Each structure stands twice: as C-alpha cells, then as structure tokens.
C-alpha cells in the first residue's frame, strides 16, 4: 500500500519558511546532519540485501550538493563539531569525497539482472559482504583528494605506443657519391649481385 500525499496550502508553506533559521551556523549543522544521514544510509546499503540504484543515486546527489555548498561557504569562526567520535582528523570534504568514490564503485559493480523474474528470488537478494580491505581503504585516507589524472601518472604506456619503423636516413650524397668515387660504385655493384641472386 502506498502512502497518501498531503497537499500544503500557501499559508502552511509560508509558516514552514519562517521556521527555518538559515544562519551560517544553522546551515552548517543542517549540512552535517544530512551528511550523517547519508553516511548511515551508505553503511546500511553495504549490508546483506541487494543495493538499490535509486538509493545510491539519491545519496550520491545529496553528497554532491553538500560538497558544492561546503566549497562555496566561508569557513566558520567556531570549530566544527567532530564528524565521527573516534576519527576527528577527517575533514568533511575528504569524507564526502571518499563516500562519492565508494558509491561510484558500488554502482559500477552492480549488474542489471538478465531475467526480471529471476531477480525476485530470495537467492538473488543475498549479496556478499563488502571486502574488508576495501572498506578499510575507504575509511582511511588511502585515496585522499587526488584527482583522476593522478591515478594515471604512473602507468607505463611505452608498451602500448606503436613504434613506427622508419627507414634509416640516407647518408648525404656528398660523402659517398663524389664523382669518381670507386667505393660507391663498388657498393652499388655488390648490392646488385645480392639482389640478383
């Protein structure tokens, strides 16, 4: 059974707008609350049930909006409250960046079901647990804030590049082809013999 939608009157919308305090500190705490909720949802989606693409997209979009808002907002004068109880050294942007990378990775790993009827079976709903090494790398600063180009700097492309075999340059004619030079004629005659045989 689906839920019923309730329509707001114009008066209710005005009252709701008046309730919100959009001062910098209130906005910062609102963003941190959204981040915590998104983190909880990401951690719950790594559980034994099948991940939902719609949920990943919603969380991904929320985190991108938060990251964009944080980059544009000036730094607060007060120190922000810790994001994690045991890991206070993480910055907000590093955390958001790692979550976005983890979401992208998990979305890439998801494969669409080949048969829609087969996807509803209980066996297909059980997904293996996430790799602990992957989660450890995700929770640490292993990936950091490096850009996409930084990942490709160490790749050796020399084996991929096509070596074009150019013929060796011809020696200048002034060295060997001087008029009356018997060496040039001798070499030319030897080449004719080799090619002719």
Swiss-Prot record:
Biological process terms in GO annotation: innate immune response; negative regulation of cell growth; positive regulation of DNA-templated transcription; regulation of defense response to virus; regulation of DNA-templated transcription
Subunit and partners: Interacts with RPA2.
UniProt keyword terms in alphabetical order: Activator, Antiviral protein, Host-virus interaction, Immunity, Innate immunity, Nucleus, Transcription, Transcription regulation
GO cellular component, one term: nucleolus
Start and end residues of each stretch annotated as Disordered: 1-23
Subcellular location: Nucleus; Nucleus, Nucleolus
Record-annotated SERTA domain positions: 27-74
Signal peptide stretch: none
Disulphide linkage map: none
Name the UniProt record assigns to this protein: SERTA domain-containing protein 3
UniProt keyword Ligase, yes or no: no
Coiled coil: none
Protein encoded by which gene: Sertad3
Functional note: Antiviral interferon-stimulated protein that plays a role in innate immunity and in the suppression of viruses through different mechanisms. Plays a role in the late phase response of TLR-induced immune effector expression. Strong transcriptional coactivator.
Primary localisation category: nucleus
Domain of life the protein comes from: Eukaryota
Annotated PANTHER family: SERTA DOMAIN-CONTAINING PROTEIN 3 (PTHR15530:SF0)
């Amino acid at each position: 059974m689906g839920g019923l939608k309730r329509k707001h009157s114009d008066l209710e919308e005005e009252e709701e707008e008046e309730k919100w305090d959009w001062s910098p500190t209130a906005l910062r705490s609102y963003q941190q609350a959204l981040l915590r909720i998104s983190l909880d949802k990401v951690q719950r989606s790594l559980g034994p049930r099948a991940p939902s693409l719609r949920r990943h997209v919603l969380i991904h979009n929320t985190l991108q909006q938060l990251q964009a808002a944080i980059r544009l907002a000036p730094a607060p004068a007060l120190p922000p409250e810790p994001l994690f109880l045991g890991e206070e050294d993480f910055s907000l942007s590093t955390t958001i960046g790692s979550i976005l990378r983890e979401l992208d990775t998990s979305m890439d790993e998801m494969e669409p079901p080949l048969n829609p009827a087969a996807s509803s079976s209980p066996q297909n709903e059980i997904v293996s647990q996430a790799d602990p090494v992957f989660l450890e790398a995700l929770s640490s600063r292993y990936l950091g804030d490096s850009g996409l180009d930084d990942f490709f700097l160490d790749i050796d492309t020399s084996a991929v590049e096509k070596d074009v075999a150019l013929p060796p340059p011809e020696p200048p004619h002034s060295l060997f082809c001087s008029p009356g030079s018997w060496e040039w004629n001798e070499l030319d005659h030897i080449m004719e013999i080799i090619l002719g045989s």
